[in-house]
């Protein structure tokens, strides 16, 4: 079964490679001149960990980092002045549970209650987690010793780390991932099925790059979460989606990585290919190996001297962080208010998350604190990525929203040196042991994020039209979800490529019905898959 899956993937790769070469030739544009030293930026967004949980204990050897001292604590009952306190610890190894990270859970973690009118005291983590499961508070208040995460420790010492980078929204995964590439979640403060089906309509940094004649690419493993953006489903962009296993190392070796490259993880945890996104209860050691592989691939690329790698986390995943979340001066990106019952105004940020800036243009041991603007209240958050890309690549397009116009940018850190460093490590430390004491639990139920990915996959192949759609994914195991997602992406890309070869309008989107999801050749009438919506 595994061999057949690999063989099918290889065949699809060859088909996409041949098709994309001819299609990209037809769509070639006049090159856009980039003025600065960085010509390629690679973005990796990991899952659900706070800064203090991952990097807080680096402060013991790096006092300039705003991390943990060991004196930080949370009461088990915020309203009781005599409540028992849970202190931070450095004994995090493996977390089997999934701490709360919904909008309402995070509100309690930040403010200690449902009242958001006061200062963010960051004192409700233990209370909120203990209400979910007795004993969870200790895990939520724990952090990793630096030696347990050797890849991150080396990157922090060799390059740059932000200690004031926040999630864009105080809520779960998907809204924050939207901000990474579009500086808004289009009013999404949780996940609404009908929006996931239609695709989110906002303009993205991918669109801005395309307008300016610059390239972008998404290297995915199970399923690209970037398909949640409606515009990326258009036929002309399907050639920008590449198998990580088959194309990432090859493109890097040949010096052909796009100007803006997004590397996505494996979101489903199976024995043969364990998840490497760091989402609890996935093994953080697998995430370390993944980051090591990405870095070493880029380090050996001929593009390295003109490249930057940014690694961040979508949100904190319910884990403790002591730095108060910014709640003042944060602009609503587009005037959209969130749905009931919270009617969130998108006017405060989420919890601080680990973020690295890696490049031969970054000095060793750089620690980046607050930004210098563009406003007195500006912060580093996920919207800083499209904001910086606009400046780094001197894009003529406007800012995407009020949020990226406000967010701090980090282009100045590439201009401190006159030339790139020659001493960047070629290899990062080996990660020999797994932190999880057991293998993948393929028969487990899907997490909330995984169910959302299944709903995305169902849209790609038309299963969202079935009466069973509202329950799709709820009864799947991880193994079943992985197969469903991978098969859906393969079918969607094949249908799209066939449609392009048949002469379909490049701005349309493949729409498929459940009865039409089997593989079809162009001679079988691929135009029946095409729809503009």
UniProtKB/Swiss-Prot annotation:
One of its GO terms (cellular component) is extracellular region. Its main location: secreted. Coiled coil: none annotated. Residues 1-22 form the signal peptide. Induction: Not induced by inorganic phosphate deprivation. Expressed in roots, leaves, stems, flowers and siliques. It is found in: Secreted. This is Non-specific phospholipase C1. It comes from Arabidopsis thaliana. The lineage of its organism: Eukaryota, Viridiplantae, Streptophyta, Embryophyta, Tracheophyta. The gene is NPC1.
């Amino acid at each position: 079964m595994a061999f057949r899956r690999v063989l099918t993937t290889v065949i699809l790769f060859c088909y996409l490679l041949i098709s994309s070469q001819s299609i990209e030739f037809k769509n070639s544009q006049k090159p856009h001149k980039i003025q600065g030293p960085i010509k390629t930026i690679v973005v990796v967004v990991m899952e659900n960990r706070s800064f203090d949980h991952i990097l807080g204990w680096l402060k013991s050897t790096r006092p300039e980092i705003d991390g943990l001292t060991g004196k930080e604590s949370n009461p088990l009952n915020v309203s009781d002045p005599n409540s028992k306190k849970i202190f931070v610890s450095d004994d995090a190894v493996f977390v089997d549970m999934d701490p709360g990270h919904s909008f309402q859970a995070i509100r309690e973690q930040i403010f200690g209650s449902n009242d958001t009118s006061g200062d963010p005291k960051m004192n409700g983590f233990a209370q909120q987690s203990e209400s979910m499961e007795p004993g969870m508070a200790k895990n939520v208040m724990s952090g990793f010793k630096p030696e347990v995460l050797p890849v991150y420790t080396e990157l922090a010492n060799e390059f740059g780390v932000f200690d004031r980078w926040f999630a864009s929204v105080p809520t779960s995964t998907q809204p924050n991932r939207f901000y990474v590439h579009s500086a808004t979640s289009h009013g999404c403060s949780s996940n609404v099925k009908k929006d996931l089906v239609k695709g989110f309509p906002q303009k993205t940094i991918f669109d801005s790059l395309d307008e300016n004649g610059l390239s972008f690419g998404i290297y995915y493993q199970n399923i690209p979460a970037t398909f949640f953006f409606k515009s990326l489903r258009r036929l002309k962009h399907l050639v920008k989606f590449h198998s990580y296993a088959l194309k990432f190392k090859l493109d890097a070796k040949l010096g052909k990585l796009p100007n803006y490259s997004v590397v996505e993880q494996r979101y489903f945890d199976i024995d043969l290919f364990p998840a490497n996104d760091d989402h609890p209860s996935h093994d953080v050691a697998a995430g370390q190996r993944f980051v090591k592989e990405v870095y070493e691939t880029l380090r050996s690329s001929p593009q390295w001297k003109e490249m930057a790698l940014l690694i961040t986390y979508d949100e904190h995943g319910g884990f403790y962080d002591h730095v108060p979340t910014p709640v003042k001066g944060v602009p609503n990106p587009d005037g959209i208010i969130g749905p009931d019952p919270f009617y969130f105004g998108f006017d405060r940020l989420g919890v601080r998350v680990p973020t690295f800036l890696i490049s031969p243009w970054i000095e060793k041991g750089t620690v980046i604190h607050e930004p210098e603007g563009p406003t007195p209240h500006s912060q580093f958050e996920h919207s800083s990525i499209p904001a910086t890309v606009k400046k780094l690549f001197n894009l003529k397009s406007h800012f995407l929203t009020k949020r990226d116009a406000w967010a701090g940018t980090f282009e100045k850190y590439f201009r401190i040196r006159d030339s790139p460093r020659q001493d960047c490590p070629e290899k990062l430390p080996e990660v020999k042991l797994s932190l999880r004491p057991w293998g993948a639990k393929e028969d487990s139920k899907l997490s909330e994020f995984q169910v959302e990915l299944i709903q995305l996959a169902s849209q790609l192949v038309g299963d969202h039209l079935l009466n069973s759609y509202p329950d799709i994914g709820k009864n799947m195991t991880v193994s079943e979800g992985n197969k469903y997602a991978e098969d859906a992406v393969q079918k969607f890309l094949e249908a799209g490529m066939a449609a392009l070869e048949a002469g379909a309008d490049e701005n349309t989107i493949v729409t498929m019905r459940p009865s039409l999801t089997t593989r079809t050749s162009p001679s079988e009438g691929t135009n029946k898959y095409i729809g503009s919506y």
